């Protein structure tokens, strides 16, 4: 039996990939009877990429970004979120989750978590609070919440069910993002 020749696979064509992602978002949003989207904006690469794809797919006026900082977010994250919204031309709202998070922590530690140490449960709680608020905004204004989770995070379990995985899938979740911040 002859062995088959292994074919060379050409390098990624970034423009083609980006255009496919734009088409995927536009198609998903319109087929689900939405015209606008809401995106949680962290100041990081994931929300920036989803925002850029959405800007081309839907236009900046159809994006409502939200920064939802806690006491653990830096001022730099908020500055990056604001720069992103200014550069892409979408509205950015800000809702601090500090009070809600602290109330949840107080309740849990006064009862169930008494004498337990801080771990991933508290970290995931922040993501889930953000998700609840974003879903409320989505429902109230009839905007589709877009997820900012990606394949790299999902493959290693670094994502939160009912947290950053909430929302309509953006087709870029099938990509593995480079760790050097280039997209």
Question: Model features per residue range: what roles?
Answer:
Residues 173-179:
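Conserved small/polar residues in nucleotide/adenosyl-binding loops
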Residues 1-38, 56:
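RNA-binding accessory domains that recognize and position tRNA/RNA substrates
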Residues 134:
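Glycine/Thr-rich phosphate-binding loops that ligate phosphate moieties of nucleotide
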Residues 6, 65-68, 114-122, 164-172:
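Short beta-alpha connecting loops at secondary-structure transitions
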Residues 62-67, 73-121, 127:
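A conserved beta-strand->alpha-helix junction
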Residues 26-35, 56, 60-63, 103, ...:
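Conserved helix-loop functional segments at active or binding sites
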Residues 35-41, 45-82:
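ATP-dependent adenylation/pyrophosphate-handling site
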């Amino acid at each position: 039996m002859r062995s088959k020749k292994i074919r060379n696979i050409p390098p990624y064509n970034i423009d083609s990939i980006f255009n496919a992602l734009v088409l995927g978002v536009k198609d998903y949003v319109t087929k689900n009877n939405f015209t606008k989207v809401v995106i949680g904006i962290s100041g990081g690469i994931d929300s920036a990429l989803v925002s850029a794809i959405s800007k081309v797919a839907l236009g900046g006026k159809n994006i409502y970004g939200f920064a939802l900082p806690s006491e653990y977010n830096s001022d730099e994250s908020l500055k990056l979120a604001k720069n992103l919204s200014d550069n892409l031309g979408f509205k950015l709202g800000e809702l601090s989750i500090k009070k809600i998070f602290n109330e949840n922590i107080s309740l849990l530690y006064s009862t169930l978590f008494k004498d337990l140490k801080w771990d991933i449960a508290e970290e995931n709680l922040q993501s889930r609070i953000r998700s609840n608020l974003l879903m409320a905004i989505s429902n109230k204004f009839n905007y589709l919440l877009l997820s900012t989770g990606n394949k790299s995070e999902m493959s290693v379990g670094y994502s939160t069910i009912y947290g950053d995985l909430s929302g309509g899938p953006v087709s870029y979740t099938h990509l593995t993002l480079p760790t050097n911040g280039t997209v």
